[in-house]
Amino acid sequence: MSAISLIQPDRDLFSWPQYWAACFGPAPFLPMSRDEMDQLGWDSCDIILVTGDAYVDHPSFGMAICGRMLEAQGFRVGIIAQPDWNSKDDFMRLGKPNLFFGVTAGNMDSMINRYTADRKLRHDDAYTPDNVAGKRPDRATLVYTQRCKEAWKDVPVILGGIEASLRRTAHYDYWSDTVRRSVLVDSKADMLMFGNGERPLVEVAHRLAMGETIDQIRDVRNTAIMVKEALPGWSGVDSTRLDTPGKIDPIPHPYGEDLPCADNKPVAPKKQEAKAITVQPPRPKPWEKTYILLPSFEKVKGDKVLYAHASRILHHETNPGCARALMQKHGDRYVWINPPAIPLSTEEMDSVFALPYQRVPHPAYGNARIPAYEMIRFSINIMRGCFGGCSFCSITEHEGRIIQSRSEDSIINEIEAIRDTVPGFTGVISDLGGPTANMYMLRCKSPRAEQTCRRLSCVYPDICPHMDTDHTPTINLYRRARELKGIKKILIASGVRYDIAVEDPRYIKELASHHVGGYLKIAPEHTEEGPLSKMMKPGMGSYDRFKELFDLYSKQAGKEQYLIPYFISAHPGTRDEDMVNLALWLKRHRFRLDQVQNFYPSPLANSTTMYYTGKNPLGKIGYKSEDVVVPKGDRQRRLHKALLRYHDPANWPLIRQALEAMGKKHLIGGRRECLVPAPTIEEMREARRQNRNTRPALTKHTPVEHQRQGLAANKKRGKGAGR
C-alpha cells in the first residue's frame, strides 16, 4: 500500500454545485451548429470551445474531455471545430457565449502539425477529415483568439492546449529562428491555462458563473495572466541576473516584531501573570506565496545565456508540491504564471474517463476518415504524466512528473464499452498505455520527497531510490483485460521505458508472452554518451539487458519477436563522429531504419534551449559554463539523418564526403567493417559531369551580362593605356 501523498487539492473536481443548465442533461454530441442547439432546446451556449482539430467525441481528444467535463458541471458547451479563419463569421455561428471562449490549436502544435523538422511543408493533417492539409492556420492559437475578439469584444478568451501551454513564457521559435513573446501577450487573450486543464477550467467556469469577472480571477493554479505588478501578499525572489538571486521584499522578523537595541539600563523584574495559551498557525512552507522574477523578454531575446538561465528556472518549478509562481516582464507589464495544478486523484481520473463520450467523430463528418481517430479508436489511455524527463520532450512541462493513474475497474469498463459499442471492433485492443507504457501506478514512495523534489528526472542518471518500480499493478491489469469475453488480443503500442522494465523482469515476461504483435517499439534515441547525456537517456547497457530478457521470454513463449529501436539525429550534443558510431552500431546489429527523425526544436524543451543558446540548462548556467555542440545548418542535419539510413544508396555520396573529411576513409569499401561501399566507376563519372555543369551561385554582387562586357572593355582600355 503506497503512502498517502502530501500533495492534495483544496477540493474535489466534482464537488462544485452544478450550474443551473444541468437540467438539459448531456448532449448526444456537443453541438457544432445552431440547428443542433435548437434540437437540444438551448437558446445560447455558456461556453464555446474553438479547436484546430476535427471534433471527435473521444477521451484522447482534448476538446472532448474539456467539453464533457464542463457539461458534467452543468454548463452548455458548443464546439467550433476548424473554423474558416479568414473572417470572424465562422466564429459567430453558435452565437455569443455567456461566459467565455476556450481556444486551442488542437492536440498538436499547429506549427509542428504543418511543418517537418526541416521546415518543409507537410501535405497531410491526421486530425482533419480525409487527412486534408491546410484546415488550420499557422500559430492557430493567435489567429483564433484574434477572430474571437473581433466577433465579441467583451467575451473573455481563455487559451489552452499544447501550443499555448509550451508558449507561456518568452520562448525560442524554431520556424522564425527568433525569441518570441509569451503567446498570452501576442494573442491579447484574457487567461492561459497550461497543462491538463480540468481543475483550472472547472474553477474558472464556476467563478465566472457566480459573477466574478475574468480580471478578478488571478489565483487559480495552472493559469497565466497579465499583471502590472506582483499579486498582493506574495514575496519575490529576483533572478533576473545570473547566480545572484535575491529577495525583492524585505524579510519579515521571525517573531513578528522588531526588537529595539539594548540600552544597558537595569530592568526591574516584572511580576509574572498567567497568560492565555494560544495555538500558533503552522509555519508557511518556504515556497508558499513566493514568486521568482525571471529575466524579461527583452533581456532573454538579446542574451542567450540569460535565456538558458530562465529556462533552467522554469523547468525546476514544475512540481506542484513545491513550485513557486513565475513572473516575467514583457514591455511595461508582466506575465504571471501560477504554480501547477494538483494532479488528479485516481477517483477523479475515473470520473473524467467515465463521462458520456460517443467515442466516434461528430456525425457532420459523414463517412470521412480521420487518421488520428483511426489510430486510437481501439486504444485506451490508462495514465497521464511521465517522470522520465527527457530533454527533447515536453510531456513533463505539460502533464507533469507525477503519474495520474486510472483504477483497474475504470479501464476494464472502457474495454467493455469499446467491445460493445464501437463500430468495427474485431476483438483487438490496439494499446493500453499513455505517454509511457509501463509507468502505470508507479510513484514516489516517499511523500516528503514527492512534495519537495526538484529533480528533472526520476530515472536519470540513475533510478531514484524513492521511485517505485514494482510493475505488479500493470501485470494484474494486463491479465484481467486478457480474460474478458470477446477480447482476442491486448497489444501494447506505447513506448516501453526499458530502464524501468529491467528492474522488474516479470513485466518483460508478461509483455513478451502475451502483448507484442511481432514488433515492440522502444527508444534508446542514441548509442553515444555525448548526446545521451544531453537527452537525459540511459546508456546502452539498459537496452542490452532489456533485449536479452525480451529475446529469452519470447523464445520461451515460442514466438519470433523483434525490437524496433527509435533514434534521433542532429540532437544537441551530437558530433559527426557520434552519428558515425551510431550508424556502425546499426549495421552491426543489422538494423535498416525506414523512418528516421531529425531533432525538432519544439518550444520550452530543454533540448531546444541547448539548440538555441549552445548552453546546457541541465547544469549551472554562466557565461563560462559548459558549451554544447549543436548540429546546425541544412548540410549537417542532412548528414546526421543520412547516417541513420546508411543503407540507402541515395545517401552514400554525402556519407563518403563526410567520412573523408573526418579522416575515416577506412570505413568506405566492401569490407564487413565498412559503412558504405566505394563509389562505382559510373558514379565517379556522374559526379565529374555534375561538377562540370555547375556554376557559382549568383548573388546581388554578381555582375549581369552587360556589366561583364563593360568590365572586359575597361580592362582592354586599361591595358592599352599602359603601353
Curated annotation (Swiss-Prot):
GO molecular function list: 4 iron, 4 sulfur cluster binding; catalytic activity; iron ion binding
Span list, region Disordered: 686-723
Pfam families listed in its UniProt record: DUF3362 (PF11842), Radical_SAM (PF04055), Radical_SAM_N (PF08497)
Cofactor (UniProt): [4Fe-4S] cluster
Binding positions ([4Fe-4S] cluster): C386, C390, C393
Residue ranges occupied by any Radical SAM core domain in the UniProt entry: 372-650
Compositionally biased tracts (Basic residues): 714-723
SMART domains xrefs: Elp3
InterPro entries the UniProt entry points to: Elp3/MiaA/NifB-like_rSAM, Methylthiotransferase_CS, rSAM, rSAM_horseshoe, UPF0313, UPF0313_C, UPF0313_N
This protein's UniProt keywords: 4Fe-4S, Iron, Iron-sulfur, Metal-binding, S-adenosyl-L-methionine
Co-factor binding comment: Binds 1 [4Fe-4S] cluster. The cluster is coordinated with 3 cysteines and an exchangeable S-adenosyl-L-methionine.
Domain of life: Bacteria
Tagged with keyword Transcription: no
Family classification: Belongs to the UPF0313 family.
HAMAP family noted in UniProt: UPF0313 (MF_01251)
Name of the featured protein: UPF0313 protein YgiQ
Taxonomic source organism: Salmonella typhimurium (strain LT2 / SGSC1412 / ATCC 700720)
Lineage summary: Bacteria, Pseudomonadati, Pseudomonadota, Gammaproteobacteria, Enterobacterales
